[in-house]
Amino acid sequence: MRIDEGKLPRMKSVKVVGDHAVSLRFESGKNFTVDLREIVFGSKGLRKLRDGEVFARVSLGEGGHSLEWPGELDIGADTVWELALRQNGHADAAEFIRWRWKHGLSLTEAAEALGMSRRQIAYYVSGEHEVPRTVLLACKGWETERQAVA
């Protein structure tokens, strides 16, 4: 599976590399170091992970669709992917992904909304292509038009 096919990101490996940081390898072949403090310390539901010994017990969830810890604690791969992009120089892709999530748009629906090809949208989501400022502005314009109609 490749992320640009529109499937949810899947992780192949995880290793703790620092204070609430993990090194991840995604099925797409991309490797990122991700600092999870923002999520861990920003979520009451994950407060047990603030303990470094508990955090160090991270493992991959079934199929690589999440990071899991004992006690039924987990963080979804899509959330980790967005954070990985944002922290590793792809803030444009992260912003684009958040726009899609906010409006519940599939790759095809996002392509139709912006008058672009589905493949190009997939490239943006995967971080393979930079999301041009004009596209991010088009997202805001689409959102504004949609709000005006509602």
Residue map of PLM features:
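Motif-centric detector for short Cys/His coordination patterns
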Residues: 1-150
